[in-house]
Amino acid sequence: MSDQLFERTMAFAGILQAVAQVQYIARHGDSDKDALAASLNSVLVTNPDSTSEVYADKEALKKGYQMIVAQLGDGKQKDVEVTRYLVGILALERKLARSANAMGMLSERINQIHRQLSHFEITDEQVIANFAGIYSDIVSELGPKLQISGNPEFLKRTQTQQKIRALLLSAMRSAVLWRQLGGKRRHLVFARKTIVDTAMKSLTL
């Protein structure tokens, strides 16, 4: 298997890892701090020498690989909600890629967060609010808003909303990288077995 296939599958796992957290937070109102940090850190690595630099926390990425196997494998337990989020994110990524203005603003706002991290942890509420603001101001404006399902009690909380938007930004970052590495939506239909095999192999590395 080629290195590019491994890297592309890693980026796709990054999308699903972020989506899994969105789903969990929407239903339960809290999140795993390490997994959240791993996803948010991926947004900040904008000029990596390799894909593995973007996903430094390999343990956190395991959930993404497991979801690839569950969603694209031969098992019957497909999660329709995950598929809906994934389709929405990939559609927004296409719109983002066509907007040089949005990409420029995105880069500028991410640099502001880099500066903020000299004073705060990446999972600090203020930092998460800034990640969420980037998603709301730039990405969300590009197309139809993703409708997140979950517990209304948690979804009405500002902190929950901000974590979800921050994680959707992380999913977008991985979607951009996946596309840059040659990922195409048709691969999810016609190359499913190859992607699943690569994910399963990646879980054993």
From Swiss-Prot:
This is High frequency lysogenization protein HflD homolog. Pfam families: DUF489. The keyword Cell membrane applies. It is found in: Cytoplasm; Cell inner membrane. The keyword Acetylation does not apply. GO terms for cellular component: cytoplasm; plasma membrane. Keywords: Cell inner membrane, Cell membrane, Cytoplasm, Membrane.
